[in-house]
């Protein structure tokens, strides 16, 4: 459960990300594909090379979804309902992959914003991404 301080940290972090969201999303995806090669199986039609337009485009989708979630942190199920349906029923993504991408997002954010990535912010973002993952996998049952 996100505390009021967590929600403040999440919103402040997403404001600092600003126009870099798409680039950070793509970088996190690249990290995930390199660190956890089995995740590539969900993207057989993608050019997974560094800087590919498809990875950049999907990175933007990830970043936009997370920005929307951060803006609606008090109603994550409502904000992510369509994505939850898509990932559970059409794409059938293994839920563990959300944890892997979350980890790669945290690493990416820490690399780009080391001064702002305090232990408290890290914990808040980790809880936020875990909450997003929980919502995205809630319709698997």
UniProtKB/Swiss-Prot annotation:
The protein's assembly and partners: Heterotetramer of two alpha chains and two beta chains.
PROSITE patterns per record: GLOBIN (PS01033)
Source organism (scientific name): Urocitellus parryii
Recorded GO MF terms: haptoglobin binding; heme binding; iron ion binding; organic acid binding; oxygen binding; oxygen carrier activity; peroxidase activity
Residue(s) carrying Phosphotyrosine: 24
Phosphothreonine: residues carrying this PTM: 8, 108, 134, 137
Keyword Ion transport: no
Domain Globin: 1-141
Name of the molecule in the record: Hemoglobin subunit alpha
Protein family (similarity comment): Belongs to the globin family.
A cellular component term, taken from the record's GO annotations: hemoglobin complex
Residues bearing PTM Phosphoserine: 3, 35, 49, 102, 124, 131, 138
Binding-site list for heme b: 87
């Amino acid at each position: 459960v996100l505390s009021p301080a967590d929600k403040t940290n999440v919103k402040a972090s997403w404001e600092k990300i600003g126009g870099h969201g798409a680039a950070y999303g793509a970088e996190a995806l690249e990290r995930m594909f390199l660190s956890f090669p089995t995740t590539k199986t969900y993207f057989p039609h993608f050019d997974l090379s560094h800087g590919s337009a498809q990875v950049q485009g999907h990175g933007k989708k990830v970043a936009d979804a997370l920005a929307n979630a951060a803006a609606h942190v008090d109603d994550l199920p409502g904000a992510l309902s369509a994505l939850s349906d898509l990932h559970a029923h059409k794409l059938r993504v293994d839920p563990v992959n959300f944890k892997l991408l979350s980890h790669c997002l945290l690493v990416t954010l820490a690399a780009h914003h080391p001064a702002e990535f305090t232990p408290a912010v890290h914990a808040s973002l980790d809880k936020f991404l875990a909450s997003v993952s929980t919502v995205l996998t809630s319709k698997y049952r």
